[in-house]
């Protein structure tokens, strides 16, 4: 688990947008795997991280275009087409992660065309697909309930038992956390960014969905200490667990 965390952290500095996606997808996929009682659920966790790892190789000038799926040049599309193979090559060099590669390979295969086996690979792939697509649509600004309804209706593309678990998780999340707008100085460990955190000049520090941990808090404080006035927006939207509410 420590090695996987280190891989995820490598994205936080180099590609904060994709690190934010890793955190969101990883969190969602792990919760879905728990509800579905997936065998060897650690594979879902690892696959969530590796699903975004190849984006480390993206040139900085096209990172946001790729992340937001804007119009891309033929050259960039060609580069992206090689990412699945690049990821498999990395996985092939790590003993014991063969099934993680199988999960990633099956994500874009409709679940009904692959038989579910005892190894749980098909179910794990279905979970990762739901987590990835839910995250994409939420990033586009769609309401969570609409996303869930849409995925549930597309029962030939998404495993119904996984989308039902997704629906259950969204209800629980709404009951156990709340959206608040707070001063940047009040941000604290355990909160989660609900919007991108950028400097006043537009430089991205952390993506929406990033968990506020000691490292991010340190980065914010370091920036504040280097400027006469804080370079961050005066207020920021965060998700606050109910147990942190004062």
Residue ranges and their predicted role:
Residues 4-19, 29-36:
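Short regulatory/linker helices and ligand/cofactor-binding micro-motifs at input modules
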Residues 13, 54, 109-111:
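Active-site/binding-pocket entry motifs
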Residues 43-47, 127-128:
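Active-site alpha-helix of zinc metalloproteases
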Residues 46-50, 103:
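Short hydrophobic alpha-helical segments used for membrane anchoring or interfacial signaling
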Residues 55-60, 141:
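Regulatory and interdomain segments flanking nucleotide-handling catalytic cores
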């Amino acid at each position: 688990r420590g090695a996987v965390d280190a891989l995820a952290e490598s994205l936080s500095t180099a590609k904060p947008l994709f690190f934010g996606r890793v955190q969101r997808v990883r969190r969602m996929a792990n919760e879905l795997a728990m509800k579905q009682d997936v065998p060897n659920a650690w594979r879902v966790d690892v696959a969530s991280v590796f699903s975004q790892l190849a984006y480390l190789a993206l040139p900085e000038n096209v990172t946001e275009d790729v992340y937001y799926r804007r119009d891309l040049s033929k050259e960039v599309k060609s580069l992206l087409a090689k990412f699945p193979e690049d990821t498999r090559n990395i996985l092939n060099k790590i003993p014991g992660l063969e099934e993680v590669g199988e999960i990633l390979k099956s994500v874009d295969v409709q679940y009904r065309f692959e038989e579910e086996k005892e190894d749980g690979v098909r179910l794990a792939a279905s979970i990762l697909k739901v987590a990835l697509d839910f995250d994409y649509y939420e990033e586009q600004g769609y309401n969570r309930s609409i996303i869930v309804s849409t995925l549930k209706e597309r029962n030939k593309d998404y495993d119904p038992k996984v989308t039902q678990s997704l629906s259950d998780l969204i209800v629980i999340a709404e009951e156990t956390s709340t959206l608040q707008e707070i001063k940047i100085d009040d941000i604290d460990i355990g909160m989660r960014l609900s919007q991108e955190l950028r400097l006043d000049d537009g430089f991205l520090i952390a993506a929406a969905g990033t968990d506020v941990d000691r490292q991010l808090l340190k980065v914010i404080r370091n920036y504040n200490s280097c400027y006469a006035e804080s370079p961050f927006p005066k207020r920021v939207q965060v998700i606050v667990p109910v147990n942190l509410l004062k």
